[in-house]
């Protein structure tokens, strides 16, 4: 016959090496096998009765000892064993029995009092009633033990947390941000057709726009948030002007050199090719036309003023040439006196200076 201490070691190892699905079977086996067999007094060594032999064959348990290690009191006389039949002496069991193999729980129970043990009785009716009475409490204790085991492990703690990844959309792959080829593939998927394949008339844009420029990338495109409404110090709305990249302005200027006005489809194609909105292209062309008109008007005014001054200069030069021609002609004594008088009046100052120089020359001589 085995001792009680020799039986406790295999049971502890069985507690640690078992699997979680066998916890319920263990609880059902504990209903028939007392957890602390040393709490009961030693039984006489007389021959067992017929009822005890039947119950011992159905539920083997370790032999009972005389020592009470837990300090537990023996059951009261008013319990299930007080029905007239004395307690039975159960047959010795080995740790390799089928009931021991099936009764291995997942983790050792923290408190032995959580699993109530029923006292064996001699009659089959008392054993069935005790099994039905303790089935609910044993199932609850097994569930509590499984919950404690799950809570003690890190996986059990993390399993209770909500999984937000199922609620939010999956993040984009990191290669989209760190791989230019992946970004190019994404851009091609976003814009499947190039600008030249779009339906419509022959485009009039700058030829560089027809090819796939680097500013076609969505990351370099102007977003509507750039023209968002901000609040000033006084709480008034403050409209910010959108900022365009140098490549976009260069393409817009080249297109404006060819045409000052864009139709709807042309404006849509240009906005699509530059990554801008149609309203941004429309407003840019309006402002550019206004600037061009002012500059053109100033240039025209300057040219007109220059032309007028040139005309006046040419007119004065022609009059002087005519006068010089009349002056250089030799005087005819038989000509009209009026003509001679006009020539003298016109060149009076020059003639006076000549007379003055002649008089000075005579005085010096």
Swiss-Prot record:
Where in the cell is the protein located? Nucleus
Q: Per UniProt, what is one Pfam family of this protein?
A: Homeodomain
The cellular component terms of Gene Ontology attached to this UniProt record, alphabetical and capped at eight, are: nucleus
- Disordered as annotated region, ranges: 35-136, 295-365
Per UniProt, which keywords does this protein have? Developmental protein, DNA-binding, Homeobox, Methylation, Nucleus
GO biological process, any: cellular response to cytokine stimulus
Q: What is this protein called?
A: Homeobox protein Nkx-6.1
Organism expressing this protein natively: Rattus norvegicus
Q: Which gene encodes it?
A: Nkx6-1
């Amino acid at each position: 016959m085995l001792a009680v201490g020799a039986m406790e070691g295999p049971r502890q190892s069985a507690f640690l090496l078992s699997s979680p699905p066998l916890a319920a079977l263990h609880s059902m086996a504990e209903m028939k096998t007392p957890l602390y067999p040393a709490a009961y007094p030693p039984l006489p060594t007389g021959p067992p009765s017929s009822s005890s032999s039947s119950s011992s064959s159905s539920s083997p348990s370790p032999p009972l000892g005389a020592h009470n290690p837990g300090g537990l009191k023996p059951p009261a006389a008013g319990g299930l064993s007080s029905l007239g039949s004395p307690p039975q002496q159960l047959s010795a069991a080995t740790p390799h029995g089928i009931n021991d193999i099936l009764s291995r729980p997942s983790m050792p129970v923290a408190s032995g009092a959580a699993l109530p043990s029923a006292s064996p009785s001699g009659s089959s009716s008392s054993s069935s009633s005790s099994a039905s009475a303790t089935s609910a409490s044993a199932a609850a204790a097994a569930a509590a033990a499984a919950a404690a085991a799950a809570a003690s492990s890190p996986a059990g703690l993390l399993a209770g947390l909500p999984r937000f990844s199922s609620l939010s959309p999956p993040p984009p792959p990191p290669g989209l941000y760190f791989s230019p080829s992946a970004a190019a593939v994404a851009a091609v998927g976003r814009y499947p057709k190039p600008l030249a394949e779009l339906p419509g008339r022959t485009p009039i844009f700058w030829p560089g726009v027809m090819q796939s420029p680097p500013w076609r990338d969505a990351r370099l495109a102007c977003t509507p948030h750039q023209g968002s409404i901000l609040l000033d110090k006084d709480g008034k709305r403050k409209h910010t002007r959108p900022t365009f990249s140098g490549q976009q302005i260069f393409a817009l200027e080249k297109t404006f050199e060819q045409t000052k006005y864009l139709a709807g489809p042309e404006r849509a194609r240009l906005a699509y090719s530059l990554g801008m909105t149609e309203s941004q292209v429309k407003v840019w062309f309006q402002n550019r036309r206004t600037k061009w008109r002012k500059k053109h008007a100033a240039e025209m005014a300057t040219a007109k003023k220059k032309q007028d001054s040139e005309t006046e200069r040419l007119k004065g030069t022609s009059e002087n040439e005519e006068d010089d021609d009349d002056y250089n002609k030799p005087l005819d004594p038989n000509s009209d006196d009026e003509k001679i008088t006009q020539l003298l009046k016109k060149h009076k100052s020059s003639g006076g200076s000549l007379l003055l120089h002649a008089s000075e020359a005579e005085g010096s001589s």
